[in-house]
UniProtKB/Swiss-Prot annotation:
This is Putative ribose-phosphate pyrophosphokinase 2. GO terms for molecular function: ATP binding; kinase activity; magnesium ion binding; ribose phosphate diphosphokinase activity. Its cofactor is Mg(2+). One of its GO terms (cellular component) is cytoplasm. Mg(2+) 1 binds at H131. ATP binds at D38, G39, E40, R97, Q98. It catalyses: D-ribose 5-phosphate + ATP = 5-phospho-alpha-D-ribose 1-diphosphate + AMP + H(+). The keyword Magnesium applies. GO terms for biological process: 5-phosphoribose 1-diphosphate biosynthetic process; purine nucleotide biosynthetic process; ribonucleoside monophosphate biosynthetic process. D-ribose 5-phosphate binds at D219. The gene is prs2. Pathway: Metabolic intermediate biosynthesis; 5-phospho-alpha-D-ribose 1-diphosphate biosynthesis; 5-phospho-alpha-D-ribose 1-diphosphate from D-ribose 5-phosphate (route I): step 1/1. Its EC number is 2.7.6.1. Involved in the biosynthesis of the central metabolite phospho-alpha-D-ribosyl-1-pyrophosphate (PRPP) via the transfer of pyrophosphoryl group from ATP to 1-hydroxyl of ribose-5-phosphate (Rib-5-P).
């Protein structure tokens, strides 16, 4: 790709953007963001960026609707500043769980997100561990779908590699993700057979042997923490000696941090795809940074190299 690179952070992911900037050895560009009394947002980019390749870091965390509007306004500002390309770094893709019509008369909001990002003027999206990989098909621009699984897998090997472990998929749709971790640990897998009900989490059975093993539950998102804690309870009842919960994205909504800290889970492992404020940090939480893989992805895009090793 021709053109000099410029890295921006809007509001949501300044710590992660700083780590990416440190890896790339470039400064973060200054962006002035004003919020008016009625909630409107105004953005001003405080340097000339004409002809550059812009990389914008913004996850859809906390107030997802506010974060999305900030991003769209930022993309419009970049386009009107005559940049060469606009590349969105969205570690956590909001609305990804609304990827299909589960009931009649429901929207497919993950597709609407794609439409908005493209129509605003983005040329590329780099994201991490989408809730549903087929969301890539909602876009007509290039999508680089990276994964934190190798980083989490390396941590698990270092800390639990000598243990008798089993990797657990929290439901049938999570088997592929669990298999990737299991292959790195050379471990068997088990599956929690859940009965889907609105606003409920009922586990019917455990498929596989967990007795006497350290059970590592691998998911993509920890939201309220209910799914993780109910998984831990049933696995311990079935004879697991310890339960470790892993997820790329830690939304930590409501009282999730208190629920997880007071649960029977030994450790919660996640990435910094979402910046958790100090009040949502807790003793059992381990955070692994994805700044390096995102930095490598930007280098690859900038230098027209394959990103396959990062998938």
């Amino acid at each position: 790709m021709t053109g000099k690179m410029k890295l921006f952070s809007v509001t949501s992911e300044r710590p992660l953007a700083t780590k990416i900037a440190d890896y790339l050895d470039i400064p973060l560009c200054e962006v002035e963001l004003q919020k008016f009394s009625d909630g409107e947002v105004k953005i001003n980019i405080e340097e000339s960026i004409r002809g550059t390749n812009a990389y914008v870091v913004q996850s859809m965390n906390a107030n997802v609707n506010e974060r999305l509007m900030e991003l769209l306004i930022m993309v419009d500002a970049l386009k009107r500043a005559s940049v060469h390309s606009i590349n969105i770094i969205m570690p956590y893709y909001g609305y990804a769980r609304q990827d299909r019509k589960a009931r009649s008369r429901e929207p497919i909001t993950a597709k609407l997100m794609a439409n908005l990002i493209q129509r605003a003027g983005a040329n590329r999206l780099i994201t991490v561990d989408l809730h549903a990989a087929q969301i890539q098909g909602f876009f007509n621009i290039p999508i680089d779908h990276l994964s934190a699984v190798p980083l989490i897998g390396d941590y698990l090997i270092e800390k639990y590699g000598e243990e008798d472990v089993v990797v657990v998929a929290p439901d049938h749709s999570g088997v592929v993700r669990a298999r990737r971790i299991a292959d790195r640990l050379n471990a068997p897998i088990a599956i929690l057979n859940r009965k889907p009900r609105p606003h409920e989490d009922e586990i019917m059975s455990v498929i596989g042997d967990v007795k006497g093993k350290v059970a590592i539950v691998v998911d993509d998102i920890i939201d309220t923490g209910v799914r993780a804690t109910t998984s831990a309870d049933i696995l311990l009842e079935k004879g697991a000696v310890e339960v470790i919960a892993c997820a790329t994205h830690s939304v930590m909504a409501g009282d999730a941090t208190e629920r997880l800290q007071n649960s029977r889970i030994k450790e919660v492992i996640t990435s910094d795809s979402i910046d958790l404020p100090e009040e949502k940090q807790f003793e059992k939480l381990t955070t692994i940074s994805i700044g390096r893989i995102l930095g490598r992805a930007i280098e690859g895009v900038q230098e027209n190299r394959s990103l396959h090793p990062l998938f």
